[in-house]
Each structure stands twice: as C-alpha cells, then as structure tokens.
Amino acid sequence: MLSEVIIYLNVKLTDTGYINDVLCLAEKLEREGKVYPAIYNSKNEYVPINFDLNGSLSYWRKSGDVSISEEENPTSGYLVQYKTTVPLKLVGFIRKENAHNTATFSDNMCQNIIGVVTTNTAVMKQVLKAKRATLTATGYSTDWRKIASDEYDNIDFEVRYTHSYFSIDFNLVIISNANCYQGFCDLPYTIG
C-alpha cells in the first residue's frame, strides 16, 4: 500500500522540475552510534543517502507510527471501514541555481510542492482501492540546522549554501475496507 503511494507521489515530484533524484521510502538507521537516513538497495543492505553536490534529491520517510482505527461505515452498515493514518516526511536538497530571489526560494518551493502532491487524490484512491485517500501537509521547515538535527545524529553535517534544504510533514489518511489491505498476507513466509 505505502509503496504505491510513494511511487505516485514521486511521479508528481519529478514533474515539478525541482528535483533530479527522487528517492523512495528511506529509514533513519543507527549504526556505530551514528544516526542517518538510508535507502534499502534490495541486496539485504541499506545505503546511506548522500546529497548530490551537482543536483538535487528528495526522499520520503515515515515520521511516526501508523495508526489504524475502525470507523462507522455510513454507506454500508455491515462492512467494516478502517481509517489508516500514515505520518510522512519529505526531505529534500535542491540547488538554488535558477532562483531569482534566494531569500524566498525555499518557501515558494515548499508551497509549490505541497500544492502539487496534495491535489488530485482520486488517482491515489483508485490505486489503493480505498473509499477516500487524502494527503495533507501539516507543516514545513527550511531551516537547515533543524533539518540536519532531525535527520542526522553524531555526524558532522556540512551545509552547502548553494542549495536549499527543506522538510515537509504530511499525514496520509486512507478510509477503506479490507480490500485495501488484501495481498499483504499472501506473501510467502516460512516458520522456522
């Protein structure tokens, strides 16, 4: 479910033209006393996210626990309806080369990105087989110190003033019945 949402959102992010390298869902890892964001590379290992000096990149990560609650179903009293809330964070690093005014570039860019990814959720609803799917921005930061302290710990973070750093918080809310979750229990597994 979440991978389909991230793929859909990344297509919309790519269309903005701001970001060269749009990564999928990352995790904050702790290794040897250091905390940093990393992407799973499908070889049973995580690769640290390295900011591209020449371009720009973004990645998504869950910013908290997913909550699921049962809700009253106003359209069908006998079917169970669920409300799933996924807190997401979009973190990015974008070159300012085309900015006319670097003082307002970061805020304008965040507002543009929010406008692009939070519109037309009908496609997302259809992909998820959900009754309703909404992505709502809950806030953003363009303060590189705050972003660095949220994403890294015990790592010397070297700021690049040629780039804008941003972090946007979202809540993904999905209203669905059990069809939205089908397929997750069908994955092969072994007990042993």
Q: Can you say where each PLM-predicted feature lies in the sequence?
A:
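Small/polar-rich, solvent-exposed N-terminal microdomains that initiate assembly or binding
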Residues: 1-76, 131
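Surface-exposed beta-strand edges and their flanking turn/coil or helix-capping segments
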Residues: 74, 103-105, 181-185
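Short N-terminal helix-initiation segments at or just after the protein's N-terminus
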Residues: 18-38, 107-115, 167-178
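Short, charged interaction patches at domain edges and termini
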Residues: 1-18, 79-83, 128-192
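A broad, low-specificity signal marking well-ordered, structured residues that form hydrophobic/aromatic
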Residues: 57-59, 88, 166-168
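Extracellular/virion structural assembly segments
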Residues: 77-125
